[in-house]
Amino acid sequence: MSIFTPVNNKTLTNIVVVRYKKGAAKFEIACYPSKVQSYRSKIEKDLNEVIQIHRIFTNVSKGIIAKKDELIKAFGTDNEQEIILLILEKGELQVSSKERDNQSEQTFKDIATIVAEKCVNTETQRPIPVSIIEKAMKDVHYSIHPTKSSKQQSLEVIKQISSVIPIQRAQMRLNITIPTKESKTLNRDKLMVLVSKIEEEDRDGGGLSIVCLVDPGSYRKIDELIKQETKGKGFIDIINLAVAKEGETKINETGKSAPTSTTTTTTTTTSSSK
């Protein structure tokens, strides 16, 4: 699509329009193809790579720019940057039905991949193939939300498909290191409430080192506790973001889990110090 606008006599080429309705009024922004979804998925963060022209239109195809009083009436402000961000986040992407179907299909696959990376089978603690996740999503009739990122939707999917397959968030493996002085005053009971399993514990040299498994939802609480208890001197290393046994789990027609040993589990490893 090529559109001529009166703004600096600029011709907009190869664009997609994001439209936001506010009552009877509608407002549009001109964006680069494929960049809107990348921005919503937190992949692209540079607005200049997403927005073709930093102006708000009432009709992009005709080059009609929204008036100041129209913006104030609809949004309570004429700050175009704020309004552009709102439209970009919550507006409806104007694409053809074929393009919409292709985007929806890709988002569907992206969500299933994220879920497979984050989760394990509840019964076997093994990874679940993406194909099984996709089938479960279809079984619960999951509908793609065009304005939500794949990551956001993956959390919704985990909850919904747990009704048809045994699935849970994979646990994280952490290495908590606390210096000698601080380890003596550590409130161990508070820490143990947040830890699922201690795999190793070492007091060599006077300090304390604990390798443990934790639920992802407990990570932030553990991080805050260690900071508080050690006055910022403790460290948390993330050994594995998702811990799973080797091999994948097959789900048969009866819903039972049948582990295989043909695939080796891959987990993402990162490290952070607090």
UniProtKB/Swiss-Prot annotation:
Protein's GO biological process: cytosolic ribosome assembly
Intracellular or extracellular location(s): Cytoplasm; Nucleus, Nucleolus; Nucleus, Nucleoplasm; Cytoplasm, Cytoskeleton, Spindle
Main location as per UniProt: cytoplasm
Classification via SUPFAM superfamilies: FYSH domain (SSF89895), Hypothetical protein AF0491, middle domain (SSF109728)
An annotated GO cellular component: cytoplasm
Keyword 4Fe-4S: no
Region Disordered: start-end pairs: 249-274
Keyword field: Cytoplasm, Cytoskeleton, Nucleus, Ribosome biogenesis
Biased amino acid composition, Low complexity: 260-274
Role of this protein: Required for the assembly of mature ribosomes and ribosome biogenesis. Triggers the GTP-dependent release of ribosome maturation factors from 60S pre-ribosomes in the cytoplasm, thereby activating ribosomes for translation competence by allowing 80S ribosome assembly. Required for normal levels of protein synthesis. May play a role in cellular stress resistance. May play a role in cellular response to DNA damage. May play a role in cell proliferation.
Assembly description: Associates with the 60S ribosomal subunit.
Sequence similarity: Belongs to the SDO1/SBDS family.
Name by which UniProt lists this protein: Ribosome maturation protein SBDS
